[in-house]
């Protein structure tokens, strides 16, 4: 089963910008015995690593950039078949948007069950799938994980300057002596 949370997004003055919705799978209903701890636990950057990155960045006059990866979990593919039953309100929305009619005959008790293709907030394995997806991508663009903290990545730029990136779920902090490298990462 899933839930939908809707909240107002406001600017720094408190002025309404837009509504933000988040679908959350009912991971508490997943059978945890099907997964090993290493399939569900995702590392997060250590506070000491963040302090070290900031301290080093300041002492070396590096440039800083922080970022948020929008809808991060949806970038990771589900590895197993995970079924999710939509509540009646979400089923109604799905049917209204389903121009091909593929879900019309699959409704039971005003609900439809779907297969998740992408990781979704709330699934017990989603955080780990997202971390693996992101760390694999960072390796393809030249970053190496730090041996002490798996959420800190480093690479040398084409100008032989170091860029350091720290990840906490879908938030990141990047520092580099090479401002062009920060621009490339955007």
Would you name each region that the model predicts?
Residues 1-186:
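Long, low-complexity, charge-biased intrinsically disordered regions
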């Amino acid at each position: 089963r899933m839930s939908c949370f809707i909240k107002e997004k406001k600017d720094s003055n408190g002025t309404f910008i837009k509504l933000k919705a988040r679908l959350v799978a009912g991971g508490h209903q997943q059978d945890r015995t099907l997964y090993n701890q290493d399939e569900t636990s995702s590392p997060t950057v250590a506070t000491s690593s963040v302090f070290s990155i900031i301290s080093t960045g300041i002492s070396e006059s590096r440039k800083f950039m922080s970022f948020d990866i929008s809808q991060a979990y949806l970038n990771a593919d589900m590895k197993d078949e995970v079924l999710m039953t939509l509540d009646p309100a979400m089923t109604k929305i799905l049917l209204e948007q389903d121009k091909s009619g593929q879900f019309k005959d699959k409704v039971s008790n005003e609900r439809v069950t779907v297969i998740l293709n992408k990781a979704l907030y709330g699934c017990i394995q989603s955080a780990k799938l997202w971390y693996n997806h992101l760390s694999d991508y960072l390796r393809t663009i030249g970053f190496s994980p730090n041996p002490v903290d798996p959420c800190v990545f480093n690479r040398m730029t084409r100008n032989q300057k170091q860029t350091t990136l720290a990840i906490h779920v879908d938030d990141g902090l990047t520092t580099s002596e090479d401002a062009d490298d920060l621009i490339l990462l955007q």
